[in-house]
Every structure is written in structure tokens, then in C-alpha cells.
């Protein structure tokens, strides 16, 4: 009567499986772009020219699935990656890949009867421990040479790009 299609799932596992299927479709497309050896992805939106990109966010933004429950998984993971972009300025592709891994593993525990609330508490505790460990082992950098070395690695070992980035960071200051 309202023009809304409703599909009833007899159990949460069926619904979770559909959502995870959508997450997998998104993560498979996006993960191909990850890292220095990431691959280009060709996107051909209906009625528009194709786009070739190695940017995971661009790939993610074009993905919309016809199945509403699979698309729900896509939209939730896109939201998580957008929050990563807003907070960190980068890392969106990595956040999509990590979110998929977390959901896959969580599904195993939920299927075995673990409470989703307890699972979330465990994930939160693990995240705190990871952040604490990273903070403990982090090595502060300050010199232009250290910045150049790191930037060079990030630029596929192109020393000239590393030097340019180090100079720019030095001029902008540590807080930009």
C-alpha cells in the first residue's frame, strides 16, 4: 500500500549472509586498488563515460547493488570509510578491507551463539589494546631526512618525490 517491498527472513543468519555478500562485493572491488601495487579499476556507469581509477573511495562511491540487503552492507561499510576519511584524511580502502575481515570473523562467532553485544565489547577492548601498543612502539620523527625517507618509501622508492614531500612538510610544519 505504501509502495514498499518487504522481504521477511526467517532468521538473522540469512539476513547477515546477505549483508556480508554485499560487503564482500564492495571490498573485492575496492581491495584491488590497495597499496603501491594496487591495480586500476574500470568503472562504467550507465549512460556515462568509463572512469579508470586506482582510488578505492572512487570505486566504492560507484557501487550500489540492486538487492536491498546486500546494498545495506555496502552502505554501512561506505559510511565507515567516510568516517575514516573525515577523521584521518586517508585510509578509506584499508578501512573497508579491515571492516570486511571483522564482519567475516564476527559472523563466525555469532553463528556459534556468541552474543553480538559481548562480541562488540571484545572488539572495543581489542581496539584499545592495539592503539595502546601502537602508541608504545611508535617512533617519533622530526628531521627532514626522516620525513624524506618515509615519503620515499611511500612513493614507491622515488627519492625525488620523497624530497619534495619532505620539503613541503617542513615548510607546512608538523600540524600542517
List the predicted regions and their residue ranges:
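N-terminal glycine-/lysine-enriched basic segments
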Residues: 1-176
Amino acid at each position: 500500500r505504501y509502495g514498499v517491498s518487504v522481504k521477511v527472513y526467517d532468521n538473522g543468519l540469512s539476513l547477515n549472509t546477505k549483508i556480508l555478500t554485499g560487503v564482500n562485493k564492495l571490498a573485492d572491488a575496492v581491495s584491488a586498488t590497495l597499496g603501491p601495487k594496487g591495480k586500476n579499476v574500470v568503472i562504467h556507469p550507465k549512460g556515462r563515460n568509463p572512469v579508470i581509477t586506482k582510488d578505492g573511495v572512487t570505486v566504492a562511491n560507484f557501487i550500489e547493488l540492486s538487492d536491498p540487503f546486500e546494498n545495506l552492507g555496502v552502505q554501512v561499510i561506505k559510511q565507515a570509510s567516510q568516517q575514516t576519511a573525515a577523521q584521518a584524511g586517508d585510509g578509506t580502502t584499508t578501512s573497508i578491507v579491515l571492516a570486511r575481515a571483522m564482519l567475516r570473523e564476527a559472523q563466525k562467532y555469532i553463528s556459534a551463539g556468541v552474543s553480538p553485544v559481548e562480541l562488540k565489547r571484545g572488539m572495543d577492548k581489542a581496539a584499545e589494546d592495539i592503539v595502546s601498543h601502537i602508541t608504545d612502539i611508535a617512533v617519533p620523527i622530526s628531521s627532514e631526512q626522516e620525513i624524506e625517507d618515509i615519503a620515499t618509501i611511500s612513493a614507491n622508492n622515488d627519492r625525488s618525490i620523497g624530497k619534495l614531500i619532505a620539503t613541503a612538510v617542513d615548510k607546512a610544519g608538523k600540524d600542517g
